[in-house]
UniProtKB/Swiss-Prot annotation:
Enzyme Commission code(s) on record: 6.2.1.-, 2.7.7.-
Record keyword Ion transport present: no
Catalytic reaction annotation: salicylate + ATP + H(+) = 2-hydroxybenzoyl-5'-AMP + diphosphate; 2-hydroxybenzoyl-5'-AMP + holo-[ACP] = salicyl-[ACP] + AMP + H(+)
UniProt similarity note: Belongs to the ATP-dependent AMP-binding enzyme family.
Induction of its expression: Induced by iron starvation conditions. Transcriptionally repressed by IdeR and iron.
Known pathway: Siderophore biosynthesis; mycobactin biosynthesis
Protein name as annotated: Salicyl-AMP ligase / salicyl-S-ArCP synthetase
GO biological process, one term: siderophore biosynthetic process
Length: 565
């Protein structure tokens, strides 16, 4: 175990954790002085709740009957403590990075807080990530452990784990929730655990966890969120959304996402003694039943899912009646869709424009419909510093479009172990270049107008075109390729692979089968495959994606489409 500082805490922000960029000392001091940072560690969100509301229901699974199942705050606290002792006994030590990849369920909460209590740094993988992404996360973070389910949504995670262990010698511990196969059983590990001594508290300025980016310029990057900044993120979001102990929050997006985790999400609900219900199935039929069963009052969706829910109200026998607040974010919600959502699901729509890297913008409860339907909100915190600049880095005029740059008390100062990316993604003053094009209205609300980076926004997920193109070009049947986003009624954008075949063509099903075997996550694979005789280029020889999109509007060549689930 690392030596403790004089106050009993583990090492200070850099803590020997190479690759972490801490907040500059002057800004950190100002955030503490202003009261944004409380000096709490993230695991105290649970311990404080267990002390204040021990008997209140903390978490439940969507299928649980009210009054049966779930865990009280005291029970969740005890399980996290026992599991932390088990992890320590296994050999996981403070500062270790552990890949956490569990589906939505109470076990996610137990595992998250157990890792925090053990002093480990969870790497928040999503259930849809596969070997390519997990291997990248393991390599960048030098992870020593992996926590997965045995099987979820029809996918067996154990063969993937075997592949990862073979390729990454630092992955010494694989813990499986369910049938462990050749690995360690979570249930047996915890059953055999003693009480153990708690890990010394972490420095609040050090990383509490690593979120994953949308992969806008290649493989997803790792986002260090400190204890100080993430406690503020969750607490301030809960206050802005007026969460109370009477609320029931439905975790319907993947729980490892920043949005349902801390905006206010699971963690924000805990700060006020509310209940979080985990829903593994976001379909309207399953989600509406969970909302009815548990009296859900708050949830968060991406636009594609919000539109599907709203449309489903026309035929589903059970529709949401208890929702007081529906957050929609992840990509832009168009005004006509916002009106439809407010009419069909709840008038309490809240648009959220944020990023796992930090900055959050919300429309406010009580904002007029025009603001809620036509803008993506304004910053969470008075200390959020925003710059909107043109292509030359110069500030734009009032109401003009430009790229959004930001820094503040909960925005990162650098991706983890990504020096080259950080040189490109931050300006000399430490402002993060978001890649989002926005304009700021006179009332302070932002309107998102597009992206600077070459990305596709599919169902709330950001996919780097360059990363997919690299995978496409690895197929021997493909001579050249371009990935473009095409408008889609339900997904926002669908992924289209425009390719020139080297010889005999392949089908979309064959291509996606190949990408699956390469470990490419399902949500990043093409929805549409278009064969072209040649890819159009600009005068300087670059592939002209705007021309591709224009041509696809009148394409009559062979086109094969298939939804990617």
């Amino acid at each position: 175990m690392p030596p403790k500082a004089a106050d009993g805490r583990r090492p200070s922000p850099d803590g020997g954790l190479g690759g972490f960029v801490p907040f500059p000392a002057d800004r950190a001091a100002s955030y503490r002085a202003a009261g944004y940072w409380s000096g709490r560690t993230l695991d105290t969100v649970l311990s404080d709740a267990a002390r204040r509301w021990p008997d209140r229901l903390a978490v439940a699974d969507a299928g649980d009957r009210p009054g049966h199942g779930g865990l009280s705050y005291a029970e969740l606290d005890q399980r996290a403590d026992r599991a932390a002792a088990a992890l320590h006994g296994l050999g996981i030590t403070p500062g270790d990075r552990v890949l956490l990849q569990l589906p939505n369920g109470c076990q996610f909460a137990v595992a998250l807080f157990a890792l925090l209590r053990a002093g480990a740094i969870p790497v928040m993988c999503l259930p849809g990530h596969r070997a390519a992404e997990l291997g990248h996360f393991a390599a960048v973070s030098a992870a020593t452990g992996l926590v997965v389910a045995d099987v979820a949504s029809g996918f067996d995670y154990r063969p993937m784990a075997r592949e990862l262990v073979a390729d990454h010698p630092t992955l010494r511990h694989v813990i499986v929730d369910g049938d462990p196969g050749p690995f360690v059983s979570w249930a047996q590990l915890c059953a055999q655990a003693g009480t153990g001594s708690p890990a010394p508290p972490a420095d609040p300025g050090s990383p509490a966890l690593l979120l994953v980016s949308g992969g806008t310029t290649g493989m997803p990057k790792l986002i260090p969120r400190t204890h100080d900044d993430y406690v503020f993120n969750a607490t301030a979001s809960a206050a802005l959304c007026r969460l109370s102990a009477d609320d029931v929050y439905l975790v319907v997006l993947a729980a490892g996402h920043n949005f349902p985790l801390a905006c206010p999400g699971l963690l924000g609900a805990m700060t006020v003694g509310a209940t979080a219900v985990f829903a593994p199935d976001p379909s309207p039929e399953a989600a509406f039943a969970a909302i009815e069963r548990h009296g859900v009052t708050v949830t968060a969706l991406v636009p594609a899912l919000a539109k599907l829910w709203a449309q489903s109200c026309e035929w589903e026998p059970v529709t949401p009646k208890s929702l007081r607040l529906l957050q929609v974010g992840g990509s832009k919600l168009e005004p006509e869709d916002a009106r439809r959502v407010r009419t069909a699901l709840t008038p309490g729509l809240q648009q959220v424009f944020g990023m796992a890297e930090g900055l959050l913008n919300f429309t406010r409860i009580g904002d007029p419909p025009e603001v809620v339907e036509h803008t993506q909100g304004r910053p969470l915190c008075p200390a959020d510093e925003l710059r909107i600049v043109n292509a030359d880095g110069e500030p734009v005029g009032p109401g003009e479009e430009g790229e959004l740059l930001v820094r503040g008390p909960y925005t990162l100062n650098g991706y983890f172990a990504a020096e080259r990316d950080n040189e490109r993604c931050f300006d000399p003053d430490g402002f993060y270049r978001s890649g989002d094009l926005v304009r700021r209205r006179d009332d302070g609300n932002l309107v998102v107008t597009g992206r600077v980076k070459d990305v596709i926004c599919r169902a709330g997920e950001t996919i780097a075109a360059s990363d997919l193109e690299e995978q496409l070009l690895s197929h021997p049947a493909i001579f050249s390729a371009a990935a473009v986003g095409l408008p889609d009624q339900y997904l926002g954008e669908k992924i289209c692979a425009a390719v020139v075949f080297a010889g005999a063509p392949i089908t979309l099903a064959e291509l996606n089968g190949y990408l699956d075997r390469r470990g490419v996550a399902a949500h990043t694979r093409p929805d549409q495959l278009v064969a072209m005789p040649a890819l159009p280029t600009t005068p300087i020889g670059k592939i002209d994606k705007r021309a591709i999109v224009r041509q696809l509007g009148i394409a009559t060549g062979p086109v094969t489409t298939q939804r990617c689930h």
